[in-house]
Structures are given as C-alpha cells and as structure tokens.
C-alpha cells in the first residue's frame, strides 16, 4: 500500500494495518519515524541517538493528514526514543511515548525502542490451516486463563520468560485437558497491579517476559503442541499517564474532551473516542497486529458493557445521551461490529469473545442479522448465580433451587462461555475453595461439585489458573500460584478430577457438539428442590447421550429412580465422590441396569446411588 493511500484510509478510519505506516521502521539506512499529532506546531523525535535534544531531529507534516515524518540515519534498532510535541495553541511541550511503539523499556522506564524486524520462522502452518476450517461451535473449547507473570516463578521470585514458560505451561495445560490458553493482557503496561488492563503499548508485548520474537516462539510452540492461544485485549479505556496517550498532542486526541463522555470514574481511565476515524484505525490496527504478527487465535475483549452504554456506572447528569437521546454508545457499537467483521474476515477460525455483563441482545450473533458479531460471550449471570448458590450452606439450598435452573431459560440466546475467571478470586472475594461452605471435607466436595457443574453444563468453558486444584488463598499478581498445596491430597485430587472432567468434555460428543443448541440439553428432573437434586441428559449431534445427576447436599441418595431414554446397561463414566478424587467412594459399582417401564415420561428407568455433594455421569453401553 502506498503511503498516500495508507494515510487516506487512516484518516477515514479504515486502515486496519496502520502499524505499517506509523511508529518506528528501521532499515539499513536508519529509522523512519511517523506519528499522528494533528494539533502540534512542532514534533521532534528525541532519543539516545541525539542526546534527547528536541532541536536535532524535527519531523515534517505529511499534508493535512495530521501525521508527521522523519528519516533519521543515526537511529538504529535498540535505540530508545520518544516524541517531543509542541501544542499549536498553548505552546506547551509534551514528551510522549510512541502510540505505535513495538517495544518499550522495562518499567518504570517508558521510552520505546526501535524494534528490529522479526527473525522468527513460524512452524504452525498446519495449525492455521486446520483452524481456518474449524467448526468451533461443535468442538470442545476449554480455556485456561493465565497471568504469565504469576503462574509459576523462579525461586527468587522473578517471573519466567516466554521460553521458560513454554517448557512448563504447555505440557501442564495439555495434561489438564485444556484446548486453549487465554493470556491476561500482555500488551505493555506500567503498573503490575493493573494486570495489564491499563494498557499504554497497544502494539508492544510487555518487556517483562522477553522479546517480541520470544512471544512469537511461545505461541508457535503452543500451536505445534495442539494448544490455541487467545489474547485478552482492552479497547475500552486507557490510563491517564501523562507520557502516554492521554492528551497526546495537548488536546483530547484519543479520548473525549468532555469527561461525561471521556472519563471512567470507576477506573480513573480515559474512554476512547470511537467516533474519531484515526482512533478507529488505531484500535483496528492493534487487533490486526496481534492476530497477524503473533498468530493469536482470537481476542477476549474486556469490559464490553462499559463500551456499549454512555451511562455505564454514571449517575444522572454525569453522562451525555446520543443523537437520538438514548444511552447507547452508537460509535462504540459500530466499532465493535467493524472489529468483528475484520477478525472473522481476515483471520478464518479466530475467535472473538466478549466480556459483557448486561442483557444487551445478540452480542454473539452475526453483524448481518443485526448482532455485534462476537463469536461468544461470557455468561456472567450463570457464573454469579452458581457462586451464590454454592456459597450457601446445603441446608438452605432447597429454597434457592432456581438459582441453578434459571440459567436454562436463556442459555441458548447467545453462544456462551461459562467463566470462573480471575475477577472471582481477587479483591477480598476469596478463592473458589474459600467460597465453599462447611468443614474441610465438605468444602472440597463442594469444589469438586462446582468443577463438574461447569463442565457438564452446556457452554464452552473458562477456568482461571489455580482454581483447577483448589488454591486456598486469593490470587495475587505478585507471587506464583500455591503449587505447594498439591502436596495436600485434597488439592491433588481436585486437580485429577479437573483433568478427567476436561478430558470427558473433550472426548464425548454429547458434552460439546451442541453446547449452543437447546437440542443438546434435556431436563430429566429439575423440580426436586426438596432433596436439592438435579438430573439431565446431554445429547450429541450424533445421537449419543449421557445422563448427568447432581446431589447438592451431604445426604446420600440411594436408589434414586430416574427416567431414561433406553433400557440396558449404563456405565458410570465419572463420579466426583470417587476416592481417587478425595471423596467417600460411594457409587454404583461401575455400572447400572435400566429396565423397561415408564418413569418421568420416559420408556425406561434406573435406580442410581447419588453420593453426598456428588455428581455422577452415566452412558448407555
């Protein structure tokens, strides 16, 4: 693409590869710098190649585009640099990092450096070809959510680099039965405590874990091992650091001038101005960059609800309505549709997943039928109802039975992911294990039940690291997971159960081929609130089925009669109360016989022993 065409599309909000134009581009003759600063009277590049003096290398404007350019023979790969921008209205001089910078010095430093062209040779062509033809809606999608800096660390507390992480994380995730990793934001960010959600480098992998090529090698290794990698991406807001995007050229360039439109009071961050064409090109190009240059398999888009509503977390008088008088952010809606159309069009098989917590309709429906175009949406309602129910003492659960059954009313209105994410194990909420009631045995039994509840309920899955083995304390970004707890038999048993549940979900068509269809789920009995028992069938597209039975109290239910579709032998595929998983080992001897005879409106019936705080999965032989 010629520069004139690239500039035109950039100003039109339709340049999805603006990273080829803007930023720092090195070659044998030096480095060319370009930056968008339409309200500047002067722009200089300052760096360690010119003593950080603004008078040495002044950029020249490229017509009326607002973009400035200079070729600097003295600047080469590895050189640090910033932009010195003089506002045309006030004369104020601002020292800014490069919005399109591809690498930054390690915090607390914030200067960008000139990044060399990638030398990584990709070996994942087979993976990408397979992904392009992947019918993900009928496939098992089981996501392990990971904060790379705190999953596991060196004994001295230093985080692993990408290569070291690959050696440990990839085999672990595969052994646990996950299909994808989802990395909390690894875009550059100054504050560890933000977990990456306050991004300052939308085109730069954080320097905490190594170079850009080391990240490429990590993703490549995942793909060659059969593991997908999703990126948590944050287009909803950005931090107020004065050296970054905020008031970039002395004006509200990437954000809105009016705080009623441009400020997130909850997070102390700025909201992008999605109606500004160049901001649209910036964000679209960021998404394209990660999927193209790093081969990520999709994006989990953070805080979508905050983007959709102009009155999000605002009181009356603290927000401005749209041109129709409504509270919908029309520009953000249009941006999200454009984003999803680009991802699905340019990267076949790549996923987009919305963290969206409201009842906004058709989030995961195609744009051509009026939807936002996401592949999937987190089911926050299911997650909240489930955790609320499991937190209750079993003696009271009979009066809250609907907290578990209500989700099926809307379960197929979207393509849902069932998440137990990082947000549920921080800020005083306790760990998943810590939310469970009862004595030690009951707490672990409830945790096993919760793990099974997620996997056996229709929907794709997401589990935050550490939850799979019942970490006792809250997660902290400042330390590694409590791997030492696996010396505790209960934690090791929970880890085994999690792996077996994941493999069951992966291997049984009945548990994944109709995750998004009401045809894949059928209640056997959802009304036994007196005993806090639920039972259902999961159906595969191939006609296969499994019987699922849950007992949410510590009282065993022997000889519990259920109606089933067919007479014959039913094998007990999984029992969360097995001694292998730390349970009391109450079960069904491995198999049951269903006899002909109508029960619950079905032609056959069987009597199953449902263990205390246990779940059983049965399959007709």
UniProtKB/Swiss-Prot annotation:
Signal sequence, renumbered to the chain: none
GO MF annotation: an example: hydrolase activity, hydrolyzing O-glycosyl compounds
SUPFAM superfamilies per UniProt: (Trans)glycosidases, E set domains, Glycosyl hydrolase domain
Pathway membership, UniProt: Glycan biosynthesis; glycogen biosynthesis
A Pfam cross-reference name: CBM_48
EC assignment: 2.4.1.18
SMART domains, A to Z: Aamy
Catalytic residue positions: 302 (nucleophile), 355 (proton donor)
Keywords: Carbohydrate metabolism, Glycogen biosynthesis, Glycogen metabolism, Glycosyltransferase, Transferase
Entry GO terms, CC: cytosol
Lineage top rank: taxon: Bacteria
Gene3D superfamilies: Glycosidases (3.20.20.80), Golgi alpha-mannosidase II (2.60.40.1180), Immunoglobulins (2.60.40.10)
Reaction equation(s) it catalyzes: Transfers a segment of a (1->4)-alpha-D-glucan chain to a primary hydroxy group in a similar glucan chain
GO terms of biological process kind: glycogen biosynthetic process
Protein's UniProt keywords contain Protease: no
Function: Catalyzes the formation of the alpha-1,6-glucosidic linkages in glycogen by scission of a 1,4-alpha-linked oligosaccharide from growing alpha-1,4-glucan chains and the subsequent attachment of the oligosaccharide to the alpha-1,6 position.
Similarity comment: Belongs to the glycosyl hydrolase 13 family. GlgB subfamily.
Subunit structure: Monomer.
Name of the molecule in the record: 1,4-alpha-glucan branching enzyme GlgB
Organism per entry: Dechloromonas aromatica (strain RCB)
């Amino acid at each position: 693409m010629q520069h004139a065409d690239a500039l035109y599309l950039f100003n039109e909000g339709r340049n999805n590869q603006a990273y080829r134009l803007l930023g720092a581009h090195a070659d044998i003759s030096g480095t060319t710098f370009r930056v968008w600063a339409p309200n500047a009277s002067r722009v200089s590049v300052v760096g360690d190649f010119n003593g950080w003096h603004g008078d040495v290398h002044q950029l020249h404007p490229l017509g009326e585009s607002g973009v400035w350019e200079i070729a600097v023979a003295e600047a080469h790969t590895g050189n640090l640099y910033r932009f010195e921008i003089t506002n045309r209205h006030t004369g104020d001089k601002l020292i800014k990092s490069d919005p399109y910078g591809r690498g930054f010095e390690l915090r607390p430093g914030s200067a960008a450096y000139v990044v060399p062209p990638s030398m990584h040779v990709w070996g994942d062509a087979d993976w990408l070809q397979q992904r392009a033809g992947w019918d993900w809606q009928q496939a098992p999608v089981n996501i392990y959510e990971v904060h790379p800096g705190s999953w596991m660390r060196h004994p001295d507390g230093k985080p692993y680099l990408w290569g070291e992480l690959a050696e440990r994380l990839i085999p672990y995730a595969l052994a646990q039965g996950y299909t994808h990793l989802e990395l909390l934001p690894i875009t550059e960010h100054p504050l560890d405590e933000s977990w990456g959600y306050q991004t300052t480098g939308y085109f730069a992998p954080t320097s905490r874990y190594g170079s850009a090529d080391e990240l490429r090698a990590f993703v490549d290794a995942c793909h060659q091992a059969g593991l997908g990698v999703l990126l948590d991406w944050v287009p909803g807001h950005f931090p107020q650091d004065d050296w970054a995007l905020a008031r970039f050229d002395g004006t509200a360039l990437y954000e809105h001038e009016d705080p009623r439109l441009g400020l997130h009071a909850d997070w102390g961050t700025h909201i992008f101005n999605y109606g500004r064409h160049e901001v649209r090109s910036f964000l679209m190009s960021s998404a394209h960059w990660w999927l193209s240059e790093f081969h990520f398999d999709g994006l989990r888009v953070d805080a979508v609800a905050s983007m959709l509503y102009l009155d999000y977390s605002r009181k009356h008088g603290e927000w401005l309505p749209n041109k129709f008088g409504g509270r919908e952010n029309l520009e953000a809606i249009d941006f999200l549709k454009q984003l999803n159309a680009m991802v699905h069009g340019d990267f076949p098989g790549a996923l987009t997943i919305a963290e969206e917590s409201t009842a906004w309709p058709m989030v995961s429906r195609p744009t051509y039928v009026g939807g936002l175009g996401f592949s999937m949406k987190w089911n926050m309602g299911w997650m909240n109802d489930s955790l609320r129910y499991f937190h209750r003492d079993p003696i009271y659960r009979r009066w809250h039975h609907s907290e578990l059954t209500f989700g099926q009313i809307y379960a197929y209105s979207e393509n849902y992911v069932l998440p137990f994410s990082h947000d549920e194990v921080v800020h005083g909420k306790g760990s998943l294990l810590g939310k469970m009631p009862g004595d030690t045995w009951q707490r672990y039994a409830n945790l096993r039940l919760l793990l099974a509840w997620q996997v056996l309920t229709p929907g794709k899955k997401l589990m935050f690291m550490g939850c799979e083995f019942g970490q006792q304390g809250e997660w902290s970004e400042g330390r590694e997971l409590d791997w030492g707890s696996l010396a505790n038999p209960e934690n090791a048993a929970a880890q085994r159960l999690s792996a077996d549940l994941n493999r069951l979900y992966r291997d049984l068509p009945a548990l994944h081929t109709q995750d998004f269809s009401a045809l894949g789920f059928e209640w056997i009995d959802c009304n036994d609130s007196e005993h806090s028992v639920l039972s259902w069938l999961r159906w595969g597209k191939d006609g296969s089925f499994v019987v699922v039975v849950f007992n949410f109290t510590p009282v065993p239910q022997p000889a519990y009669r259920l109606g089933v579709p067919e007479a014959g032998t039913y094998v007990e595929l999984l029992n969360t109360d097995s001694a292998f998983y730390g349970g009391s080992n109450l079960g069904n001897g491995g198999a049951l016989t269903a006899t002909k005879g109508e029960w619950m409106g079905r032609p056959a019936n069987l009597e199953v022993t449902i263990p205390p705080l246990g779940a059983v999965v049965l399959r007709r032989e």
